[in-house]
Amino acid sequence: MAKTYSAVDIQILEGLDAVRMRPGMYIGSTGSRGLHHMIWEIVDNAIDEAANGYATEITVTLKKDGSCEVTDNGRGIPTDIHPQLGVSAVEVVYTQLHAGGKFNDKNYAYSGGLHGVGASVVNALSEWLVVDVYQNYTHYQQRFESITDPKTGKIISGHPMAPLAKVGNTRKRGTQVCFKPDPRVFEDTHFQSDIVRRRVRELAYLNKGVKFVFTDERARDADKRVFEYCYEGGIADFVKYLNTDKTAITDPIVFEAMRDGLLVRVAIQYTDSYTENIYSFVNNVPTPEGGTHEIAFKTAVTKAFNDYARRIGAIKEKEANLSGDDFREGMTAVVYAGVKNPQFEGQTKGRLGNTEVKPVFEAVCLEKLSVYLDDLKHQEFAQRIVEKAIKAAKVREASRKAREIARAKNALEAAPLVGKLSSCTGKKAEQNELFIVEGDSAGGSAKQGRDRHFQAILPLRGKPLNVEKKRLDQVLANEEFRSLITALGTGIGEEFDITKLKYNRVIILSDADQDGAHIRAILLTFFFRYMRELVTEGHVYIGMPPLYKVAKGGKTIYCYDDNALPAAIKSIGRGYTLQRYKGLGEMNPEQLWETTMNPDGRKLMQVTIEDLTEADRRVTVLMGDKVEPRKAYISAYANFNKQDDFKPVTESDR
């Protein structure tokens, strides 16, 4: 480290160098999420053309060479010379940060690409990028590459290899962008077909009548190569799709309005489930963290249904209103806002911050819902939802009393989790870990083998409830979940507060068999339904205990999957001993520490949510009440012909 610090140490990153230096600031990460965010940035631009009425078809193609191509039949990026910079507008868009046509509503009424950095960021982080523009019967093309400066040895990001050129005549119109992510930037440059396809399908739902085509040229099976999506019902079709594996108890409520320059689109459908699922978007961009539009929607739902319940006498004059949670139980909703100047929190656009959106969005939703509920045609539906909410309120009140009793009991007992939780001595939550361990036997080994300075152990005695099939009061009555909730310290549901989390890592440690997998699924379902922020903030992990121990003399190799076993046997050589672990309890404390708990050598799998809608559907299918969808899913993805591909070890083999 330098001993002096002066003006000469201040670096000025010019052009796209800043993007390559700190890619996470622009796309979130250099892992899978950031890699796919590159596609979304280009697709957002194509979507903006469609959302503003200029494009009718958008294609996304994953090429065999690892590149991605996005095409629309919109107006095409302007090809004339920029008056200030003296180069084509295409070159400006792809080489200048904060350059674009979306900073006012002259060219786009609604846009997800307000920041003006999407196209240039993708260029900066690509090995190469080619733009084709079809405009005024002319085909234009320009190529950019991230090259190495022969003088300095530094990488020049997104360098134009030549000016924009006319390469032919055409009757086509629109823009085509093809880019190949740079392996010098990303941990892995392989695009996952399912992630891209699901997002393309989602965009088709959000853009009624626009045709989307997704092609994966890498796919071996013809039926997995090309997918076309076009939905004339728009978000009404979307909520039906989201509830495919649930039991809907109403038809969708759908309304749309334009007021004060704000576009409001909402679709609601109720099911017989106990959880709510609200998916919000702004200008086609998902807002998984919500924002002012989602808050406005929830407020309007609460007021509209409470007012209606009072009008029909379901809530008496002296009785308190029901909570919003009561009216949203079993609700699936798609909430869409078209905002002229959206203010997102960060370039990855997780939350809408425009304060002016809330009063307008709320007023529209309240007005539309009130009219709907008062319509004589909808009385049966409206009364059914009110009755469902009243039942939910009773359950919520019972749950509240149960929590108060539990808190009072905990306050009276010096150590409410004695005999269950083995706490760590460290007081810094950001350094501490909680292992949720299957069974008392493994729990005992984990307690002995752990580093008690920062590792706490919570053994699970028996199998917890499948919360997908239970109400909140039933969840709180389960001893295993009560212990877990108390240990974490965050509360659950509407009372969840992540700032009170006592452990930075929550690690599920179960056997590598069917029972262990079921326990993992049950715990993940609980976290997803009642502590989702624990997952989205990256605190939940799955421990990976070894399947095999191969040893000879003083040399030992642990194998964490079947594929690693042959190499381990070859490395150890003749005369080895082989042990297969069927459960955590078969390992002594030292082995459990060495293989599964020691931060220097263990393997952990972090649990993330890449696609909220797909995660919800899979939890519903695998953990819900309907048998047929689960059987269909298992039939499609489980390999019943799989056999152990190892043979008994004989003395001659050794």
Descriptions of predicted regions:
Residues 1-8, 16, 40, 48-50, ...:
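GHKL-family ATPase ATP-binding module
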Residues 21-40:
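Conserved short strand/loop->alpha-helix "switch" segment adjacent to the catalytic nucleotide/phosphoryl-transfer site
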Residues 48-49, 76-77, 514-515:
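Residues immediately C-terminal
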Residues 77-100:
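Short conserved segment of the HATPase_c
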Residues 394-413, 428-433, 444, 448-450, ...:
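C-terminal interaction appendages of subunits in large macromolecular complexes
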